[in-house]
Amino acid sequence: MLKIRPDRNIGSNIQKARYGKGLTQDETIAKLQLMGIEISRSTYAKIETNRINIRVSELIALSKIFDVDFNYFFEDLTL
């Protein structure tokens, strides 16, 4: 049976999308909060560095903020 590796690339893909929009973490968090997603700076930083998992609702909001397809965050994931 294959072991599933942590979703290491999701955080990296989030960071790439944020850079692509020219946003800082603080600006991204402010936009998330305007959409009703309560998240702290430390939590967001942990998501981008793959130390904690992200909620689906947060991914959906980020896809709208960064104007990317939801599937973008799952590119280059490996088992």
Which ranges hold each PLM region?
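Helix-turn-helix DNA-binding elements, focusing on the entry/boundary residues of the two helices
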Residues: 14, 25, 41, 56-59
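Residues in the recognition helix of alpha-helical DNA-binding motifs
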Residues: 17, 31, 47, 76
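The alpha-helix within a helix-turn-helix
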Residues: 18, 29, 33, 63
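Short alpha-helical DNA-recognition segment
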Residues: 23-46
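DNA major-groove recognition helix of helix-turn-helix/homeodomain DNA-binding modules
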Residues: 51, 55-72
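A short, Lys/Arg-rich alpha-helix, primarily the initiator
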Residues: 1-21
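Short amphipathic recognition helices of helix-turn-helix/homeodomain-type DNA-binding modules
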Residues: 72-79
